[in-house]
Amino acid sequence: MNEFKQLSWQGLWKNNPALVQLLGLCPLLAVTATVTNGLGLGLATTLVLIGSNATVSIIRNLVPNEIRIPIFVMIIAAFVTVVQLLMNAYTYELYQALGIFIPLIVTNCAIIGRAEAYASKNPIGYAAFDGLMMGLGFTVVLVLLGAMRELLGYGTLFAGANLLLGDWATSLKVTIFTTDSPFLLAILPPGAFLGMGLLIAAKNILDKRFERMFAAKQEAKVVQRARVTAET
C-alpha cells in the first residue's frame, strides 16, 4: 500500500479523528443539529487542516524544536482567521449559526496533532494530503451525526443547505415527516452524545467483522498452501 492510500485509509477509517482518536468532540457535539451545520464546520476544519499541514511541512526545517508548538498554533490560528473571514463574507447566516465554534477550530487537537505528528516530519505533498483525508474523515462524521439528529429531531434532511451552498440548494431539502414540535432529545447535546456513541459502536462492529473475514481468508490460504504441498 503506497503512502497516499495509507493516508486515505488512516484518515477516513482506521485512525479517524472523531471515531477513533475522539478529538474535536466539543464542536462536533455542539453544532451538528443539522447536516448543513455539520458540513459547514467540517469543510472549514478541512481547509484549516490542509493549509496548516502544508505550511508546517514547508517550514519544518526552519523552526527550532523548542518553540515549534507555539509556532504551529500561530499558523493554525492564521488559517482559522482566513476561513472565518471568508465565511463571514460569503456564508454569513451559517457563520452566525456556527458562532464561537469557528474560531475554536484553533483548539481542535486533531489539527495540532497532525501538524506535530505528521506534517512536521514529511514533504508538503504528503502533509497536505494527510490534512485533506483527516479533514474529510472528520467531515463525514459531522455530516452523519447531523443527518441522524436532523432526521429524528425535525424530520428533514439538508434543511438550510442554501446557507452554505447558495439559493439553488434550497431545493435539496428533503422532508421525511412533519412535526409540530421537534424531538428535543435528538437536537440537544444529549442526543449528540447518544448518536456519537452509536456511530462509534457501528464502526467497532464493522472492524471486528472485517477482522474475522480477513482471518478466515488467511486461514483458507494456509490450508490451500498446505494441501498443495502435501500433494506434491
Curated annotation (Swiss-Prot):
Alphabetized UniProt keyword annotations: Cell inner membrane, Cell membrane, Electron transport, Membrane, Translocase, Transmembrane, Transmembrane helix, Transport
Superkingdom as given in the UniProt entry: Bacteria
Localization annotation: Cell inner membrane
Record's bilayer topology term: Multi-pass membrane protein
Main location: membrane
One of the protein's GO biological processes: electron transport chain
The protein's Enzyme Commission number: 7.-.-.-
Keyword NADP part of the UniProt annotation: no
Keyword Electron transport found: yes
Pfam families from the UniProt entry: Rnf-Nqr
Spans through the membrane: 18-38, 39-59, 69-89, 93-113, 128-148, 182-202
One GO CC term, this protein: plasma membrane
Assembly notes: The complex is composed of six subunits: RnfA, RnfB, RnfC, RnfD, RnfE and RnfG.
Family membership noted in the UniProt record: Belongs to the NqrDE/RnfAE family.
Functional summary from the UniProt entry: Part of a membrane-bound complex that couples electron transfer with translocation of ions across the membrane.
HAMAP family per the UniProt record, alphabetical: RsxE_RnfE
Protein name, as recorded: Ion-translocating oxidoreductase complex subunit E
Species assigned in the record: Pseudoalteromonas atlantica (strain T6c / ATCC BAA-1087)
Encoding gene, per UniProt annotation: rnfE
